[in-house]
């Protein structure tokens, strides 16, 4: 317990999770803390009304709480002076893949993608040509050389069909097979699917099978339409 001068007390409890990917979704995380199987819940009700143990809940990740401490210390105006017009502040990204300098970086929202890849990351390793960068984790999308002038913020990435997500950036070079990359991430989501939503549970399996078929040299143009149809159904029908 921590006691302040005004007599306010609160308890901090640390609960260890098993690292399930689905627990990145807030209602799944609360289910895990409650001791039941981690599965997403329909919203509404939202956590602010009915969250952990059906009580009003303020649920945020560590990066948000770190930003709150900065705002409390330096004021909201100081924090809002950083970033882009709609995405204020900074974001931590994890640079990985075929890039010279990997690691964690913190940049202002609105920095151009090319500046992150080339100025901070040093460009592709071994003098290879840049092909794409996958953003937003397994559920994100890929950006190519034509997106180098794109500001990295929520609105700009959303406008081209990808997300910031947890801040992952995996760089691919000219030697990378994008179908293999897609198959790798789909294999992960297939294994990590909680199984609650049929479109996700079955869709990831079907997409993985189609990508396996393509990479084995047996693909056909009709497979592309099947992939689009399954992906659309999953996006429209799955909870998270």
Regions found by a protein language model. Give the residues of each.
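Terminal amphipathic helices with adjacent charged low-complexity linkers/tails
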Residues: 1, 10-12, 124-159
């Amino acid at each position: 317990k921590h006691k302040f001068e005004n007599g306010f007390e609160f308890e901090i409890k640390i609960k260890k999770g098993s690292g399930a990917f689905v627990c990145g979704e807030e209602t799944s995380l609360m289910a895990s803390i409650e001791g039941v199987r981690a599965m997403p819940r329909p919203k509404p009700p939202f956590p602010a009304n009915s969250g952990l143990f059906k009580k009003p809940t303020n649920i945020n990740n560590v990066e948000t709480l770190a930003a709150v401490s900065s705002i409390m210390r330096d004021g909201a105006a100081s924090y809002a002076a950083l970033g882009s017009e709609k995405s204020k502040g900074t974001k931590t990204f994890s640079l990985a893949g075929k890039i010279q300098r990997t690691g964690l970086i913190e940049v202002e929202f609105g920095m151009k993608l090319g500046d992150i890849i080339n100025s901070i990351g040093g460009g592709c390793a071994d003098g290879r040509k840049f092909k794409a960068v996958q953003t937003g984790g397994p559920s994100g999308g890929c950006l190519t050389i034509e997106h180098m002038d794109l500001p990295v913020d929520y609105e700009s990435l959303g406008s081209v069909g990808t997300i910031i997500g947890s801040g992952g950036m995996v760089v691919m070079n000219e030697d990378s097979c994008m179908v293999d990359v897609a198959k790798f991430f789909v294999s992960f989501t297939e294994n990590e699917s909680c199984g609650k939503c049929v479109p996700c549970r079955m869709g990831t399996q079907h997409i993985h099978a189609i990508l396996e078929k393509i990479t084995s040299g047996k693909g056909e143009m009709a497979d592309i339409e099947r992939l689009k149809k399954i992906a659309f159904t999953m996006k429209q029908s799955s909870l998270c």
